[in-house]
């Protein structure tokens, strides 16, 4: 019997439902409150509803965050809702999340060689469902790797624009035959993960942190598209608070992604680290 996730009252998966049942995520008041909070939005941002776009999503986003809707975005940073999904454009660049680009990393035996998967692999073989929280989701690529390995992942993204792009990417992935099994293990919440972690009752296996590092310089053609995202995301200014919230949540392990030569997050030395050519994963076992 294959098990599918059911969410408890704190949004964390419970793998105790057989595949003849359907589950729906319960929206608890705390999460609703987080979703309703108006986050800082780029002043020049506008919303555009293109042909075949989901008008209800576009209007709900514009109303919640006080962003104007326009048919002629011009040079402004534009969040477009059209038949292809949700995309961001501006500064001569455009970006839309697409997990199809990740398929080559999770097929043909490559997944086991991913550093993050090696860091997140349980030390003992477990029969239970693995659960993770990605507290700084961004566009969800790392969460996709965890979900491909078998984790039920709750992704938190505080920036409303990035969260809208991420939710759309997950929605489209769930309609893709090759991606849907992985995407069904990903649940996106727009809000402050510190608030969520401080109220978490049931511990998870992994809490993953990848706060934006202010000194990291990204180059290359692919990353030019991500420059749009970086214009919206601010470097983490509350590293101590974020790390303390993760500690208080009492996971089995905290994994922190860092540039190879960067100092440890909040000055906390890890239990061990996995080093790559440009990045490392600091692992804190509880």
Model-derived features: where do they sit?
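S-adenosyl-L-methionine
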Residues: 30-130, 159, 163-202
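Conserved proline-anchored active-site loop of SAM-dependent methyltransferases
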Residues: 132-145, 204-220
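Conserved SAM-binding motif I beta-strand of class I
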Residues: 152-157
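Mobile active-site "lid"/loop adjacent to the S-adenosyl-L-methionine
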Residues: 212-242
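Conserved Class I SAM-dependent methyltransferase catalytic core
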Residues: 239-285
């Amino acid at each position: 019997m294959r098990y599918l996730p059911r969410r408890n009252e704190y949004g964390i998966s419970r793998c105790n439902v057989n595949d003849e049942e359907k589950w729906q995520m319960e929206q608890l008041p705390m999460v609703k409150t987080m979703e309703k909070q108006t986050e800082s939005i780029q002043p020049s941002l506008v919303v555009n509803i293109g042909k075949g776009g989901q008008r209800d999503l576009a209007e709900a986003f514009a109303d919640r965050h006080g962003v104007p809707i326009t048919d002629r975005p011009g040079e402004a940073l534009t969040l477009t809702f059209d038949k292809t999904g949700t995309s961001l454009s501006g500064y001569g660049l455009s970006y839309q999340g697409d997990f199809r680009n990740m398929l080559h990393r999770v097929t043909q035996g490559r997944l086991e060689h991913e550093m993050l998967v090696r860091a997140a692999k349980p030390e003992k073989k477990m029969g239970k469902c693995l659960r993770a929280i990605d507290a700084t989701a961004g566009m969800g690529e790392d969460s996709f790797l965890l979900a491909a390995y078998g984790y039920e992942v709750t992704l938190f993204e505080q920036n409303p624009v990035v969260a809208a792009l991420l939710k759309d990417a997950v929605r489209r992935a769930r309609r893709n035959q090759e991606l849907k099994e992985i995407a069904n293990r990903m649940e996106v919440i727009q809000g402050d993960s510190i608030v969520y972690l401080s109220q978490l009752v049931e511990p998870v296996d992994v809490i993953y942190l990848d706060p934006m590092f202010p000194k990291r310089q990204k180059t290359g053609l692919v990353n030019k598209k991500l420059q749009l995202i970086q214009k919206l995301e601010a470097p983490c200014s509350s590293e101590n608070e974020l790390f303390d919230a993760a500690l208080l949540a009492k996971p089995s392990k905290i994994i922190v992604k860092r540039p190879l030569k960067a100092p440890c997050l909040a000055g906390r030395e890890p239990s061990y680290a996995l080093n790559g050519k440009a990045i490392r994963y600091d692992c804190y076992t509880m």
